[in-house]
Regions:
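Short, well-ordered beta-strand elements
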Residues: 38-52, 60, 69-74, 166-172
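A conserved helix-loop-strand patch within extracytoplasmic ligand-binding domains
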Residues: 115-170, 254-257
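Ligand-binding pocket segment of bilobal, Venus flytrap-like solute-binding proteins
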Residues: 167-238
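Bacterial signal peptide processing site
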Residues: 22-25
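C-terminal motif of bacterial Sec signal peptides marking the signal peptidase cleavage site
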Residues: 15-20
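Periplasmic-binding protein-like
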Residues: 129-131, 136-140, 224-259
Length: 259
């Protein structure tokens, strides 16, 4: 079957610019896809059930279409427990991911911490048939957030300060309960004990409302969330590296080849 050459570096640069994620060379150098000719090759682009990830995926899709490919969009699939099996099965060809979080999903005992270490470890840990293309400079980190009033009342600046803040309830997606940076990680690394309330909107408006209403005292919110910009919320620093560096990185199936 004839391979059709596409300039994936151009596609990625366009996609990340559209998504306001900064510059990256990647969906990876000179690449080829299995197919006959541009316009007859269909690539499946997927996204997480989170708005900023969907924006990046849509930007990838539009850039691929601009290069002459037919794109099948499968957006807002869900979280990793749902979409990773589809990626491993080859049902999805291009998917925006985050280096640190994906590494910890695949290897809860990962010891890499710096951006380059995390990226290298991820590339060596990915299941057969999946590749991490070049990571972007941009990150979209998990973070732990309290209200500004709660931070002031308890003199909070870092995650470790929560150990002296009384009874705490953490809110986040249900899978946070078992993530390495969830309640167990908070306890093991910082000595912070929390109760947990699942809120299934990936740190979105429902989580922010629960935090501001006092239903929870601590929230898992992504660093790119615009709700963090108005001064009513405080992002706690993470000096011990509970959260790994999480750069935007395209995952590609074996149908997209660096030739």
């Amino acid at each position: 079957m004839k391979r059709t050459m596409i300039t994936m570096a151009t596609i990625a640069a366009s996609a990340l610019a559209l998504a306001a994620c900064g510059s990256a060379e990647s969906v990876g150098g000179n690449a080829s896809t299995e197919g006959s000719e541009n316009g007859q090759t269909t690539l499946v682009v997927g996204s997480q059930d989170y708005y900023s990830n969907e924006i990046i995926a849509e930007a990838y899709a539009q850039a691929l279409e601009g290069a002459g490919f037919t794109v099948d969009r499968q957006m807002r699939i869900g979280q990793r427990e749902v979409y990773m099996p589809e990626l491993e099965a080859g049902s999805i060809d291009v998917f925006p991911e985050y280096t640190g979080n994906l590494l910890q999903y695949l290897d809860q005992n990962a010891t890499a911490r710096s951006s380059d270490e995390v990226y290298d470890a991820l590339r060596s840990t990915l299941p057969k048939g999946l590749r991490a293309l070049e990571q972007a400079g941009a990150t979209d980190q998990d973070s732990y957030v309290v209200t500004a009033d709660f931070a002031a009342a308890h003199s909070l600046t870092s995650i470790g300060d929560l150990a002296n803040a009384g009874t705490l309830t953490l809110g986040g997606n249900s899978e946070l309960r078992t993530r390495p940076y969830g309640p167990t990680g908070l306890s093991n690394l910082y000595g912070v004990t929390v109760n947990f309330t699942p809120i299934e909107d990936s740190g979105g408006p429902l989580t922010v409302k629960a935090l501001k209403d006092g239903d929870i005292q601590l929230a898992n919110i992504y660093s790119s969330d615009p709700a963090l910009a108005d001064g009513t919320l405080t992002v706690l620093t993470d000096p011990k590296g509970l959260f790994l560096a999480s750069h935007v990185v395209p995952l590609a199936s074996s149908r997209v080849n660096d030739d």
